[in-house]
């Protein structure tokens, strides 16, 4: 399981009816499409978005310069580049700025629950990133703090049926340890 108890991917949250017809990463560089995304220098979610966009562009013709330019244009289409992953969600869902919010799949579903499925649609692009957030016990830290047993129990719990059901309930993609 490569030390990850669940996975996710980056999807697009768009306004209801998808008025800008956003279907794939290439749509994010259209001049009339405003992209709301976090800064990849300050946000882990922003880094996943950056990597997903870059991977899409690179896979078009294996040209790193073109992939760099593509991602640069995605960010130029951003009227606001927030510092954290939650900021862009607030900017998009509450403040009503932008046409598309690239975000983790679970976050997109949370927006539907919090703000109403009648206001937004989720678009799954044909290609995206396979996000695997890792977990690990750092032995030196756990030993120094006397928390090794608790840390190991927590790690073991993450792969139980109960924890996997919790991940699924919150729109993450569970993964069972073999």
Show which residues each predicted segment covers:
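Residues embedded in well-ordered beta-strands
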Residues: 11-13, 121, 134-136
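Short beta-strand->loop
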Residues: 14-16, 33-60, 74-78, 123-125
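Extracellular/periplasmic juxtamembrane helices and adjacent flexible linkers that interface
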Residues: 142-178
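Extracellular/periplasmic catalytic domains that process cell-envelope and extracellular macromolecules
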Residues: 3-7, 27-30, 44, 93-96, ...
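Solvent-exposed loop/turn segments at secondary-structure junctions
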Residues: 12, 17-20, 40-45, 106-109, ...
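Ligand-binding pocket segment of bilobal, Venus flytrap-like solute-binding proteins
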Residues: 60-126
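N-terminal segment of the mature folded domain
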Residues: 1-42
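Short helix-loop capping/hinge motifs at secondary-structure junctions, enriched
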Residues: 17-23, 42, 55-63, 141-151
């Amino acid at each position: 399981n490569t030390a990850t108890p669940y996975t996710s991917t980056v999807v697009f949250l768009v306004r209801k009816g998808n008025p800008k017809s956003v279907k794939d990463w290439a749509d994010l560089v259209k001049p009339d499409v405003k992209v709301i995304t976090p800064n990849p220098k300050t946000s882990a979610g922003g880094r996943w978005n950056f990597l997903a966009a870059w991977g899409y562009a690179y896979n078009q013709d294996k040209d790193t310069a073109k992939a760099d330019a593509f991602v640069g244009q995605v960010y130029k289409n951003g009227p606001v580049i927030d510092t954290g992953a939650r900021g862009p969600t607030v900017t998009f869902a509450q403040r009503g700025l932008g046409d598309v919010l690239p975000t983790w799949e679970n976050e997109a579903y949370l927006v539907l629950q919090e703000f109403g499925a009648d206001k937004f649609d989720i678009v799954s692009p044909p290609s995206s990133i396979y996000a695997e957030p890792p977990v690990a016990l750092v032995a030196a830290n756990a030993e120094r703090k006397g928390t090794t047993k608790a840390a190991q129990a927590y790690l073991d719990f993450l792969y139980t049926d109960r924890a996997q059901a919790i991940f699924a309930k919150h729109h993450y993609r569970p993964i069972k340890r073999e």
